[in-house]
Amino acid sequence: KCNPKNSKCVNGIRYVPINVVDLAGLVPGAHEGKGLGNKFLDSVRTADVLIQVIDVSGTTDLEGNPIENADPAEEIRFLEKEINEWFTDILLKNWTKIKGKNIDSVHSILTGLNISPEVVDHLADELSLPKTRITWSEDEVRKFAYKIRERSLLILIAANKIDLPNAREKFDKLVKEFPNRTILSVYADGELALRKANEKGLVKYNSGALDFEMLANVSEGQRSALNKIAKILKENKGSGVQETLNAAAFRQLELITVFPVSDENKFADNFGNILPDAILVRRGTTALAFAAKIHTDLAKSFLYAIDAKKKIRIAKDYVLKDGDVIKIVSAAK
């Protein structure tokens, strides 16, 4: 049995923590500074992926006001447009630093957005834009900015309120309308209710599970409410909350889970804790890069690593796999 330090293990399921930030809401014209647009867009700079929570039932407008039969597709298009225009504005406002120069000048303007020179270069080629003595038109700048957004900022859609009338029909329509987007149906109210009930000892529930167990101390009123939640959970194949986080981490960002240990025979740290840490890294991460993530000194004095499952030595350029248990061996100081 594992003894997690940086995460938790519930009924054999390892839950690895990630940083989730609740961003300020957007209103139309956010890229021009309206509302809290600047605060939101500044936060986007450091995000690996965005989860856009929309009202799939169509009972609120773009500013969160109650309304009847709104089109949830408008929410998706609205956010995409605002971020696209924000990327465009960044380039246009700095155009004097780009005009007449080469593609490196474009990358220098976009460095705060974690966009590599290779991506900038590739997208310019994809759009057949000149990369020396740049004189792109405003339309070409806009097309380039849109491509940059598509490549650098992943947006996943959490279609919430799936339990309300007409929501399922609207959800199915969204999936057809945006075939290239990741859209998940979410029942956040149900997830919250079950987590609270679990804390109070009324149910046994693991986040992400398709059902739950009611315990003996549940009142008739609580049983009735929980039965309704169970019905929706079954129809939706879960609440969708954990599934959304999993999709963001594993599908969008292509993360894998790797377990560092000090004792490759017992899968433990120096204190005997079994699989104490679970670390999320990008698919394609090497043993050396993993060592650097644990501590920079480990990477500097890296000798080799050990695959604890196979009991074999692995080199610094070994590409890690999901579920690997790894010991890093470094030179003694």
Label each residue range with its predicted role:
Residues 1-51, 57-77, 135-146, 333:
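Switch II of P-loop NTPase G domains
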Residues 25-27, 55-61, 69-73, 84-85, ...:
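Conserved nucleotide-binding/hydrolysis micro-motifs of P-loop NTPases
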Residues 42-45, 77, 81, 176, ...:
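A broad, structural surface signal
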Residues 45-56, 81-88, 163, 179, ...:
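Non-catalytic alpha-helical coupling and interface elements of nucleotide-dependent molecular machines
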Residues 48, 324-326:
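Structural signature of the urease/amidohydrolase superfamily beta/alpha-barrel
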Residues 51, 61, 90, 94, ...:
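Secondary-structure transition/capping residues
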Residues 68-78, 86-109:
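Single-stranded RNA-binding surfaces
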Residues 95-322, 329-333:
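C-terminal-of-GTPase-core extension/linker across diverse P-loop GTPases
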